[in-house]
Amino acid sequence: MNTPVEKPWILGLTGGIGSGKSAAAQHFIDLGIHVVDADHAARWVVEPGRPALAKIAEHFGPDVLQADGTLDRAALRKLIFEVPEQRRWLEALLHPLIAEEIAHHLALAKSPYAILVSPLLIESGQYAMTQRILVIDAPQQLQIERTLQRDQTSEQQVQAILKAQSSREDRISRADDVVVNDRDLAWLHSEVERLHHFYLTLSGGQS
């Protein structure tokens, strides 16, 4: 089957917690690039009225719903971390729906290329939707320091998140481009701008 000509050229953008991938994504947005965040898509598919939320409530019971009918993420997170089989059930339900939601929003792109930002780009298989992978990397201690400064969380929780994500080595081995974000924001912006011009060339836009 031929690929539709209007399908956008897609860059996958990923990085571990505290790496700076959100700051990089925001600068691509500032440069006029259409960005779809997989975390947002994951929230959209479980909004009230969507079929996935009804299936989750039916499977786990009413305790995973808040009084206003929205998903109680903390309650659900506790259930799936305690029972791995339940996590697998949830992933089997949500991953295809999230991929569908992402594809829909990527197809709306009017910019020369589009970006899929996902912390689990590699682990979830979402990289298959992209033509190229950019990894924002940072030394682990810097990841921890940034996350502790940004979030109301403990170092133990940050370490748990790091363990759940792909290792730095695995992410980098899958990357086409890597930015080691261990300097200031101005430097990160300059790297994003350099890559932006490169991606314009690759995608057939103006450089």
UniProtKB/Swiss-Prot annotation:
InterPro entries, A to Z: Depp_CoAkinase, P-loop_NTPase
Pathway the protein acts in: Cofactor biosynthesis; coenzyme A biosynthesis; CoA from (R)-pantothenate: step 5/5
The enzyme's E.C. designation: 2.7.1.24
All copies of domain DPCK, residue ranges: 10-207
GO cellular component, as recorded: cytoplasm
Any Pfam family hit: CoaE
List of residues binding ATP: 18-23
GO biological process: coenzyme A biosynthetic process
Compartments it resides in: Cytoplasm
Kinase among keywords: yes
A single MF term (Gene Ontology): dephospho-CoA kinase activity
Catalytic activity: 3'-dephospho-CoA + ATP = ADP + CoA + H(+)
Keywords, in A-Z order: ATP-binding, Coenzyme A biosynthesis, Cytoplasm, Kinase, Nucleotide-binding, Transferase
Primary localization: cytoplasm
NCBIfam families from the UniProt entry: dephospho-CoA kinase
Family: Belongs to the CoaE family.
Function description: Catalyzes the phosphorylation of the 3'-hydroxyl group of dephosphocoenzyme A to form coenzyme A.
Protein name per Swiss-Prot or TrEMBL: Dephospho-CoA kinase
